[in-house]
């Protein structure tokens, strides 16, 4: 007599893992990823530009000046905005976020899963592009600093844009206003705003780990290197906390007009 055959069903995914996988599969389709890669290609062009600049004593200084204005102030926030809007804002506008919001999943898991999914995409696209730009510029010694600065800055931006997506349906418009009006214009004049800006703090991370940084990139009142990393981690946690609170009070409706 043979023993009865028993069949075991595969262990179901946890709710958090399901949110994370859904974020990567559904919220970041190929067209969105292509939109992320376009500014990343721009980062490589900035690397070529730094290589062509000949009015700096070293390639490292040339790349530092170009990266500060081109990569950390333009490429990184735009690419992170595409990611941040994809993981939440676009679904809210289309009316499909209802299906996630109405599930018996804790709000904090939805927020954290969306942020981790977006951060993963940023870490494999934006940050490597910044490091590769340093190599293209002939400043390979700064590639590690460029990767770290772009990585920390982009994941902080993703958290910020998720929070904005929980506050308003016009995520892209308000996010651009935050980046270019508040961070770039007001942040250039007011150190208090720059201290909370992913753009300015990512530049400070990059500059802090350079052996011979240009004096014009060192700004008083903003921590450099590891201090800037800690500051952006705090900004990220606060942004996620705001997103968690606001998502619990969202009033969802149909697709935006």
Each model region followed by its residue ranges:
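Secretory targeting signals
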Residues: 41-87, 94, 111-178, 183, ...
């Amino acid at each position: 007599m043979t023993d009865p055959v028993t069949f075991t069903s595969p262990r179901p995914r946890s709710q958090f893992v399901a949110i994370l996988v859904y974020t990567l599969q559904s919220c970041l389709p190929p067209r969105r990823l292509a939109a992320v890669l376009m500014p990343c290609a721009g980062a490589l062009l900035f690397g070529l530009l730094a290589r062509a600049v000949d009015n700096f004593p070293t390639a490292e200084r040339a790349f530092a000046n170009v990266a500060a204005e081109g990569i950390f102030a333009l490429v990184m926030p735009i690419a992170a905005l595409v990611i941040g809007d994809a993981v939440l804002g676009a679904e809210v506008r289309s009316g499909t976020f209802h299906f996630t919001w109405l599930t018996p999943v804790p709000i904090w898991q939805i927020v954290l899963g969306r942020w981790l999914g977006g951060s993963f995409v940023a870490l494999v696209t934006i940050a490597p592009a910044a490091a590769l730009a340093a190599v293209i510029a002939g400043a390979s010694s700064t590639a590690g600093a460029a990767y770290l600065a772009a990585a920390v800055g982009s994941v902080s931006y993703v958290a910020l844009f998720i929070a904005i997506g929980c506050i308003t349906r016009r995520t892209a418009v308000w996010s651009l206003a935050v980046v270019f009006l508040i961070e770039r214009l007001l942040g250039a004049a007011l150190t208090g705003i720059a201290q909370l800006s992913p753009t300015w703090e990512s530049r400070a991370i990059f500059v802090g780990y350079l052996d011979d940084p240009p004096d014009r990139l060192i700004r008083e009142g903003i921590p450099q290197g590891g201090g800037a990393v800690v500051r952006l981690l705090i900004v990220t946690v606060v942004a996620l906390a705001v997103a968690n609170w606001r998502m619990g009070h969202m009033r969802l409706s149909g697709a935006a007009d």
